[in-house]
Amino acid sequence: MDLLFAKIICIGIFLVVTTFGCFIPHLMGLYKEKENEEKNKRVKNILSNLNCFGSGFIFSIIMFHLLPETIHIISDHGNIRIFNTSDSQMKILYIFFFVFIGFCMQLGLEYVLPVDTNICCVSNLDSKKKLEDTLSQHITKNASTTVNIEMQNIDNIDHIHEHSCEGVHTHDEKSIGKFLEILTLQSFFLTISLAIHSCIEGMIIGTSTDVNYVFISSFCILLHKWIAGVTVSLSLNSNNMNKTLKAILLLTFVFASPLGIVLGHMAKSAGQKVTCLINAVSIGTLLFIGCEILLNEIKQNISRKVRLCKWLSFCFSCLIAFALISFTTSMAPHTHGDIDTHVHVHHHDHDHDHGHNH
């Protein structure tokens, strides 16, 4: 199959899965109470194990494919220079520096940018809990055991807005207040940060040079993509935000991964140096996401048996990913154009010198 055609197929799949994830709350009627407690428990177990399974695939695609391949390309290509050096050891060190940049960037998006809590992983976990809670017959609007971060933010915003407008009723200040209200909404930062994260994930697919790895990487990312769509949908629907702005934010999130695939494919033509640096930043981002999802699942106040099941889901997905990557590599090993060209030129020069001597 043609590489470009494979990426186009993945773009279509991402659009469908992401859109479906955003509509899951509406399709399942999650804003209403349900009375089937057994169904609630089953959904809870499926969501938890699916999160652990997805984090295992994320971890595996980093450790067994992206990181080794990036290091291999950088170390074997003497013509690639990073920060004006062609030394292999220094270039590998710089690659890990860009991994560190990606890790810190995702850390900032989750723990520095938000108002109250981190965005991607814990919000996904909160959304998962919200999905579970709304399916339970014992849910009440003001349950004391559940902390509704979004509504708490709105109450704080309303209080700040009322306090700031005491004695002042000018049109300009009201407009500024509405603008600040939007910026301080947790859901606004949540959607933007998840869109950035999705775009970076898409770049990994876009920079791939092998059809098999395009589909493997897509499968790895799609395993947790739907829950991100649920997160965005639940968050936006819990705020009194303008419908136009909601639509813009939803479309931004839905088209983020396809945009990343397109940008990654364009960057691939810029050379292997750019591809390796993009992959390094993506590795740092995915490493943070994969570990954070797993830790948030396992550290919950649950029994040892449930923890064991989640750990086994993680390990099982890692083994599946390792088997897929090993099989793909053995069936269609990578060939790097620059190395082959260098060997061909060297061989041609050697034959030319040999003929000249005779």
From Swiss-Prot:
Signal peptide positions on this chain: none
GO biological process, one term: iron ion transport
Topology in membrane: Multi-pass membrane protein
Family label: Belongs to the ZIP transporter (TC 2.A.5) family.
Chain's gene name: ZIP1
Alphabetized PANTHER family for the sequence: ZINC/IRON TRANSPORTER (PTHR11040), ZRT (ZRT), IRT- (IRT-) LIKE PROTEIN TRANSPORTER (PTHR11040:SF140)
Description of its domains: C-terminal histidine-rich loop acts as a negative regulator for Fe(2+) binding and thus determines selectivity for Zn(2+).
Keywords: Apicoplast, Cell membrane, Ion transport, Iron, Iron transport, Membrane, Plastid, Transmembrane, Transmembrane helix, Transport, Zinc, Zinc transport
Primary location recorded for the protein, binned into one broad class: plastid
Topology, Extracellular side: 1-7, 75-91, 208-213, 268-273, 332-358
Descriptive protein name: Zinc transporter ZIP1
Molecular function terms, GO-annotated: zinc ion transmembrane transporter activity
Reactions performed catalytically: Zn(2+)(in) = Zn(2+)(out); Fe(2+)(in) = Fe(2+)(out)
Knockout mutant characteristics: Gene knockout does not affect asexual parasite proliferation.
Membrane topology, Cytoplasmic segments: 29-53, 113-186, 235-246, 295-310
Induction profile: Induced in response to Zn(2+) depletion (at protein level).
